[in-house]
C-alpha cells in the first residue's frame, strides 16, 4: 500500500536537500514553508534573497531556515563555471558564455545537483518542460547503460478494502514514438520506480492486440519489445502485447490469455507512444478518480523532476517528497 508516510520515513532516515529553481514563486514558498516545518527535507531556493524574502513576507509564508543561493553572488561560481565548461567542452563553451548560461536558475540549479550541493531538483512552476529537462540531459546525463530519459506517472486511489490502489504508467510525457529498445528501457526503469511506491511490478506492454489477436506494425513493436524485455529482465513478470482489459480484468484475462501470470493483475503499464500514454493516464485521473503524481523523470544520474505550470502548492510539496525520496 502506498502512502506518503513511507516516503517520509525514507527521508527521515537519510534527509536530503532539494533545489527549487523558482525561489520567488509563492507556490514554491508555500511548499518550502511546509517542508521547513519538518526535518526530513531541506529546501534550497534559487534567486535573489531580498526578492524571495519579500515574496514570502507578502504571501505570509515562514521560510526561516531555508537556504537561499543567488546565482549573481555565489561564492563557488568560478568552480561551477570550470566544471560547466568541462561538461560542455564538446560544444566549445567559453567561461564567459558559461557565466551567462549559469545566470539562468534552471542551469544554475542543475549544477548545484551536479556539484553535490543538493541531492535533487524540482522545477517547472514557471519554466517549460524542455527548459527543465534540457539542462538535466546536458549536465546530469543518463545513467550508465541508459540511452534515454523517460517518465512515469504514479496513480493512486483508495480501494474497497481501505488500502490504496497504486499503478504506474509510462511513458506519458517525454518520448513521442519510442522504439522497441527504448520501450524495454522504459519498462525496466518504470518497474524500479514502481517498487519505491510499494508496487510489486507486473508489467504489461499495451496494444490493441492480445498475443496475436491483431496485426500491424504497432502490434509487432509492442510484441517484440515485450519479448526483449523478458530476456533482459528474466525475474520481472512481463506480458505483451496485451490489451488493457486483459491486463487488468481477471475474467477477461482467463479468456484471452489464461496461462499468463500478469494478465488480469498488471499494475505497471507501458504505452506504445506518448499519445496513448498521455490520454491513458488522464482518463484514469479524470474518470477513474486516481490521484496522478508526475511526471517522474527516469534514467538520469540524479532525480530531476518537472512541475506543471498550473501546479498548486500541495502538488509542489508532494512532488518534492517524491523527488527527494528517489535520491
Report the location of each language-model feature.
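Anion-binding alpha/beta catalytic cores of soluble intermediary-metabolism enzymes, centered on
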Residues: 1-263, 268-327
